[in-house]
Amino acid sequence: MRRRFATVVVLVASLGLLLSGCSADAPEPSATAPADAGAVRNDLQYGTASGEKLLLNACLPEGAKGATAAVILIHGGGFDSGTKDFGGMTALCAELADGGIAAFSVDYRLAPKYAYPAQVNDVTAALEWLREPAQVAEFGIDPERIGLFGSSAGAIIASSIGTKGSGSLNGGDRVAAVVALSPAVDLTESGLLLGDPSKVAIASILQYLGCDDFTECPNARDASALYAVDKTDPPFYIAMSKNELVPLAQGQAMALALKSVGVPVILDVKAGKRHALELLDEATRASIRQFLIEELVTASTRTD
């Protein structure tokens, strides 16, 4: 059963502007949103880990009527670089808000100083923080309609949280939808047989796992979203290209696993070698717009 929200018509119309102009080769955006955008609040602390402050940027819709859907943005950077302002995330944050969805671009601890599960724990902490009554009231968000949008390394983190979440959408660590651009979902030694991963990708994953090689890497399976798939997982939108940094076989395996347990999934495959935010051409933006409308704006709350 689906329930409709008072804001649906407004959000569907305004989401026509969502994600426009977010190519990965665009100049690094400034941390300041356009003057006509909704409120932007930078460097909000959502937690502390290992003595370090964990920060996020909030981009809030202007003139929202009622509680809005929200998306947590998770940057890429090979796990050892990047920030909440990195790789087009600032622009994407503002554009989501302009389309009527609250967006929160998060920092997380980086490798090699911190290995898995530090990154997953940090983003999960941001999710749980946003669901606290104080933040729900302050940001005007619906805690049951929070999704994740991850790019590259961020897509690995998003996929992990999406498949491992438990509890209710009100107060647990489950999410309502996942957008994953170029995710690697099987980080085990056998997972390397899926396609032909580049040396750069392998090095980044090993650093994330805190391992020197895959033969003795106890974190590898636990960090692999593929092995955590079950019927309670949220709908996934997976975008990849045929010859990119992450083998297409990784995305295909994830899509097959999700479909096998009845979880809605879109696998959007592009030609060429585009990776992560480079995938955001007009067709992909339009498809993601529709996905977010269906899964965060107009969808009913899941009870399984």
List PLM regions with ranges.
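Bacterial N-terminal signal peptides that target proteins for export
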Residues: 1-9
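C-terminal motif of bacterial Sec signal peptides marking the signal peptidase cleavage site
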Residues: 18-21
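Hydrophobic helical h-region of N-terminal Sec-dependent signal peptides
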Residues: 10-15
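Alpha/beta-hydrolase superfamily serine-hydrolase fold, recognizing
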Residues: 24-304
